[in-house]
Amino acid sequence: MRRPDRLAEPELRRSGVFTPDIETNAVGAQSYARTSDQASIAHGRSELVDHICARAARLTQWPVAAIEAMQLVRYRPGAEFSPHYDYFHPDTESGAAEIARNGQRVGTLILYLKTPRRGGATLFLDAELEFLPARGNALLFCYGRAHDD
């Protein structure tokens, strides 16, 4: 199988978020701030997944063991993910628990599998940057420390 989206497509469910004000489970809680669908793809699930993880490790210079399971995320027309930070907020119960289990996130790598007809940009509001998605492109951004909201 050469397409990670086909591998996990049957498992797509409404995306969740980690929030300080509500109880969450391992995949977070549903929120109007994030209206996409997602599925987790564990390391070792297929040769393709392992190949993608190995390439991500080489690109980022992070060990494969430190890379989370891949997330397949699908945005239908009108879906969005409101401005947010990808790291876990250490001052919240859910953030502290996730950091204790798996450590703090230090970066995000997005691989674009499709070029949308419209929309789909990733915005970096503080830096006033906009990244438009295109099939085959990747976006890597890192955060050195948790940032006060």
Map each language-model feature to its residues.
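Fe(II)/2-oxoglutarate oxygenase catalytic core
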Residues: 1-149
